[in-house]
Design a protein with these regions (language model features):
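Histone-fold recognition with a strong bias for associated Lys/Arg-rich disordered tails
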Residues: 1-112
Length: 112
């Protein structure tokens, strides 16, 4: 049900959280991983997005607002906001009778 690109983005978002020593996994981690994905970049550029600026702003946000942990979590805990985005993404796909979820669905759910 989840497309390959989306799986890669989820895995990279977990890696980003670990690298930044964050014990929680947020929407911003997921968005930052999307900014490193070719399909995500393509969609955002077609909408007029400045990828470099969005990366910088998202990194700044994560460093400023997400607490640094001395220990690296093996599995950062998803925030309730991230849970809602995932639920919304799945719900939209089910309601439109689609069998798979892709990067576009993720971005639509984040912007919702």
């Amino acid at each position: 049900m989840i497309g390959q690109n989306l799986t890669l983005i989820f895995n990279e978002s977990i890696d980003i959280a670990k690298e930044m020593h964050h014990n929680i996994l947020t929407t911003e981690h997921l968005f930052l991983a999307t900014l490193n994905n070719t399909q995500g970049i393509s969609i955002l550029q077609k909408c007029g997005g400045n990828i470099q600026e969005m990366r910088q702003m998202t990194n700044l946000y994560l460093k400023k607002y997400i607490p640094y942990s001395q220990e690296v979590s093996k599995s950062p805990k998803q925030t309730p906001a991230l849970d809602r985005i995932i639920e919304s993404m799945v719900s939209h796909a089910q309601n439109s009778n689609r069998q798979s979820i892709d990067v576009g669905d993720l971005l639509a759910s984040i912007m919702e």
